[in-house]
């Protein structure tokens, strides 16, 4: 019997890098509401007392960058100086330019179907049947811990919580099946006055226990709650934050490969984002169809070229049919050209700020989580 441990981490919406992601995606959403053809690459940097929003944007839309940035920061919970960051009073700097005309000529086409990829690159998508949302379990539960932290903070149930937090979940596997939680790490920013006893008890009873399956917990499970003992200074006062610095948190928690391209602040013409969503969509439909227990898709593109330069399917020995057949089915049922996948997944809509915390995958409200091709794939593969 083979046994091993696997760990994934998540961070809260108040983590500095996630503040930056949410600002960048909020800018993207506001632009897409006004200009569906906009080209957006928005980057954000946050540090004590300031937020810098920059990048390359070509659009007919007008967005009040300053007020939008302040709103995002305040919505997260940084509303007064005792938090170490205040959306009402921080400086907001704007350093936005236009997209290069050299890129435009390679992307835009008279026939939209011929739209070229906005850049070269490789993208991966992944799915596994170890959770109901067809995502790896460690990252799924790490995200849920962070969502619960935000819920009890914002509701006032644990009023001493502050926005910055991190989680980490280590699962124990035997013969590739989860048999329990080996360790949980949860570090959360808090107010000055809360005692360590109250903090430990509150986090355990209101965050950890309601989220993790009771059958996975045992007397051997290790819990590390604020292991340094104090976490008052947090958010951008503790660390600077940058868009695109949490690409593993955003995807599969290290359970699958990553092409290296970040998502937030990029419009769907950027295949770093849209093709990674499409790859997840393809992998999830293959697993939902019962064609594999685990599936990883790799796509690659050349700048200015519509068709993917490669498609790879890997099922890690769990496939019910040959990988070569799966590749041909992917080509048959999924249009993976940039314009095709944008239409297939209805990506020109203001949905991106919501993706920028708690993971881009495994959340059913997003169109790339549909399994509407699962039955077609199953029939075409000849499975009963």
UniProtKB/Swiss-Prot annotation:
Keywords: ATP-binding, Cytoplasm, Magnesium, Metal-binding, Nucleotide-binding, One-carbon metabolism, Potassium, Transferase. Its cofactor is Mg(2+); K(+). Its EC number is 2.5.1.6. It is an enzyme of class 2 (transferase). One of its GO terms (cellular component) is cytoplasm. Its main location: cytoplasm. InterPro entries: ADOMET_SYNTHASE_CS, S-AdoMet_synt_C, S-AdoMet_synt_central, S-AdoMet_synt_N, S-AdoMet_synthetase, S-AdoMet_synthetase_sfam. K(+) binds at residue 43. It catalyses: L-methionine + ATP + H2O = S-adenosyl-L-methionine + phosphate + diphosphate. Pathway: Amino-acid biosynthesis; S-adenosyl-L-methionine biosynthesis; S-adenosyl-L-methionine from L-methionine: step 1/1. Residues 99-109 are annotated as: Flexible loop. Mg(2+) binds at residue 17. The keyword Nucleotide-binding applies. Binds 2 divalent ions per subunit. GO terms for molecular function: ATP binding; magnesium ion binding; methionine adenosyltransferase activity. It is found in: Cytoplasm. L-methionine binds at residues 56, 99, 239, 270. GO terms for biological process: one-carbon metabolic process; S-adenosylmethionine biosynthetic process. It comes from the Bacteria. ATP binds at residues 15, 164-166, 230-231, 239, 245-246, 262, 266. Catalyzes the formation of S-adenosylmethionine (AdoMet) from methionine and ATP. The overall synthetic reaction is composed of two sequential steps, AdoMet formation and the subsequent tripolyphosphate hydrolysis which occurs prior to release of AdoMet from the enzyme. PANTHER family: S-ADENOSYLMETHIONINE SYNTHETASE. Belongs to the AdoMet synthase family. Homotetramer; dimer of dimers. This is S-adenosylmethionine synthase.
